[in-house]
Amino acid sequence: MILGLTTILLVCFIPLVFGAVTADSPAAVERERPAPVAKETNADRFRRGLGPLPPTRREHNNLSPRASSVPCTRLSNNVGMLQINRVSDGQKIGYLSARFNRRKAYTVHPRPAAALKVAVPPVTAFGVAINLVAENPPDSTHMFLGAVDDGQGNVGSGEAGVAILSGTSSVHANSPPSSSASTSLTLANHGGVESQIWTMNCQTRQVTAQWINTDNSHPQTTIFYDPAHEYLGLSGDLEAHSAAVSRRAFGVFITFVPE
């Protein structure tokens, strides 16, 4: 009788031991997992008298880079010279000359005393097109430092066409070449004129150009100097231009140097 009772107790006890839920068992984990918290909405916050949720930050890979978070400061002197340096090695080759070449295009002079003096806006916002206005122009009827289509087609990749720097009349920013604007350039069969094509980094004072084609396309624009023909110009493909016209042309960068 005692043996039979012991057997019954063991039979009842074993399932309790081996069937018990341990702390590591899936059932225990599921039971201990906290219930999901409902995402708070602006409506929930408004009902509790709170302000709206902060805006969600999203990462974008196609954001345009900014030049700097440092604000532009007013120039103490907004009249100065334009220094010309070779892109390949940074060597200074001179300054934008106050005299034209034989076709009345702007060229380079090694001495600052012979440099063209230009006025820039006292404050230049990043990326905003500006005019460069000559203070001692070789042609007083064309005081703007502009560019003139050479008549050989668009400026752009694979194109030999360029724009030549010369004195011009004023043309609005973001405009294709104007056939009604005038220029000092005496090159035969040249195309239209642009003047407000420049931007200046207010911290480095580097001056860059953006040419606009007749179809309103905006090609990547390289400033270059051609020592064989003694002129400065704008190209969208300097290799294509050099192969077709002048193998001596090379890229340059321009820096505004206040007086």
Language model region names:
Residues 75-170:
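N-terminal "domain-start" segment
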Residues 2-3, 51:
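Long amphipathic N-terminal alpha/beta scaffold segment
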